A protein has these predicted regions:
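Conserved N-terminal structural module of periplasmic/extracytoplasmic solute-binding proteins
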Residues: 2-110, 125-129, 173, 304-306, ...
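Conserved C-terminal helix/tail region of periplasmic/extracytoplasmic solute-binding proteins
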Residues: 167-168, 173, 251, 380-432
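Hinge/lid segment of periplasmic solute-binding proteins
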Residues: 106-156, 209-212, 298-300, 364-368
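A structural signal for short loop-to-beta-strand junctions that line the ligand-binding cleft
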Residues: 91, 98-99, 127-165, 308-309, ...
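Glycine-centered hinge/linker elements that transmit conformational signals in sensory
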Residues: 186-189, 229-259
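Long, aromatic- and glycine/proline-rich binding clefts that accommodate carbohydrate-like moieties
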Residues: 297, 348-398, 406
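Extracytoplasmic/periplasmic substrate-binding proteins
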Residues: 52, 212, 243-326
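Extracytoplasmic/periplasmic solute-binding protein
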Residues: 148-152, 157, 181-232, 276
């Protein structure tokens, strides 16, 4: 969520329930094969790798750089996002997975538990920077104390704001609000300009909403799930405050009416056109937006109602498939993707977020402070961990969709609405 969305994940998560049930049926548990090996071999071996379409460009950039500088060769296959989970499930059952598998970070707990990935604990322990790897991704890829994956790419949520509209509204474009209450006041002033709207969200996109609003709860010191990922904690005062503000902005017209039916495909379009003052979204959106006289983009952390900051850390993890017979060559590639050479000179150079906190203040980030904000948030944000995350939160027919729709657009008290739906969400999380 990403993984998407999270920003990029909405479409691919629609098939989550079926795919994860298939994984449960075809894998009995974590594999111990070659779990203690630490060797990395670059001897001309050809290894296979799978990734999803939203991550294709990112993954291909790394593959091309590795292939150009190593004897080993990586053959990358890209699958459509909406069929990727089922493809993995089928291949896992037939023991025909590729050597290297990239996967949405929200599915890492399931993949680790079901034996899709090889245990990488001993290999990761050889990395002198292992403690600097994106903590949310590492936690998601760890099962019963063993590490099954490492960060591949990061897409995290942050506040995007249009500096042009801030100036027109008499706001300081270099000092964005540091509280949710402040975001509301700023959005209200931008909206008062008349020809634009103050704020926007994807009201019919469950992934978009959790990606951009859960950090507000975290920033307030709240939680959305229990530590086991089997119960929801969305019936809190912090959550009621957050969704109460979202509902208020819609009711007052600060958020345009079109937000109610925005299901994700075009949810960043209005901002990119310079017609929205403030909109939390994913970091990867920055690369695709063209700035000009109507749009100059500022980036800030997502705040809580009274302060604090956080981010939903989505994206992908990378691991060695349990059925691979080329683990040493696969590890050579994976470990190289985490190296300073790859993280800075390949990824940061192309305006991507580094997965290592010790490289966050790299040369390229110093040239664009927005990248520096993203890099710092990568170490501060959270990734909710639950085996049943997809069917509960990203499936448009799941219980979270009903909950957030009622919270944003319903007539009942927001707090009461969240309490009413919290039990249904918990039932889904706790289900097999």
């Amino acid at each position: 969520m990403s993984s998407l969305p999270p920003l990029r994940a909405r479409g691919r998560l629609a098939t989550a329930a079926a795919a994860l049930l298939l994984l449960a049926a075809c894998q009995s548990g974590p594999s111990a094969a070659d779990a203690g090996g630490t060797t990395a071999v670059d001897d001309g071996t050809t290894i296979t790798m799978w990734t999803r379409s939203p991550t294709a460009t990112f993954s291909q950039t790394l593959v091309d750089a590795y292939n150009a500088s190593h004897r080993n060769k990586v053959e990358l296959t890209v699958f459509p996002a909406d069929s990727f989970q089922q493809k993995v499930g089928t291949a896992a059952g037939a023991k025909q997975l590729p050597d290297v598998l990239a996967a949405d970070v929200v599915y890492a707990p399931n993949y680790a538990a079901k034996g899709v990935y090889l245990d990488l604990t001993a290999r990761v322990d050889t990395l002198d920077f292992k403690g600097k790897l994106a903590p949310a991704h590492m936690e998601a890829a760890t099962h019963q104390g063993k590490v099954y994956g490492v960060p591949h790419d990061i897409d995290l949520s942050a506040v995007f704001y249009n500096k042009v509209l801030f100036e027109r509204a008499g706001l300081d474009p270099e000092n964005p609000p540091a509280t949710l209450d402040g975001l509301y006041e700023a959005a209200k002033k931008v909206d008062a300009l008349g020809d634009v709207d103050g704020y926007f969200y994807g009201g019919a996109c469950p992934g978009c909403m959790l990606f951009t609003t859960w950090p507000m709860i975290w920033a307030a010191g709240g939680t959305v799930l229990d530590e086991q990922g089997t119960a929801a904690t969305l019936d809190s005062d912090a959550a009621a405050d957050v969704y109460g503000t979202m509902r208020r902005m819609y009711a007052e017209g600060i958020v345009p009416a079109s937000a109610k039916n925005e299901s994700g495909p075009t949810w960043t379009q209005l901002f990119a056109e310079g017609r929205i003052g403030i909109q939390p979204m994913g970091a990867t959106a920055l690369q695709g937006m063209k700035e000009g006289p109507e749009l100059q983009i500022g980036i800030a952390p997502i705040p809580g109602p009274k302060g604090g900051r956080s981010s939903f850390v989505g994206g992908d993890v990378l691991g060695i498939s349990a059925n691979s017979t080329k683990a040493a060559a696969a590890w050579d590639f994976i470990s190289w993707t985490l190296s300073e050479q790859a993280q800075v000179e390949v990824l940061a150079k192309n305006k991507n977020i580094t997965v290592r906190s010790d490289l966050a203040d790299n040369t390229y980030a110093k040239q664009d402070n927005r990248l520096r904000v993203f890099n710092l948030l990568a170490g501060e944000g959270q990734t909710p961990i639950s085996v049943n995350f997809g069917k509960t939160f990203n499936d448009t027919n799941g219980p979270w969709t009903a909950a957030v729709t009622d919270a944003l657009f319903g007539s009942q008290d927001v707090g009461a609405t969240l309490k009413q739906h919290n039990g249904t969400i918990t039932e889904s999380l706790a289900g097999s």
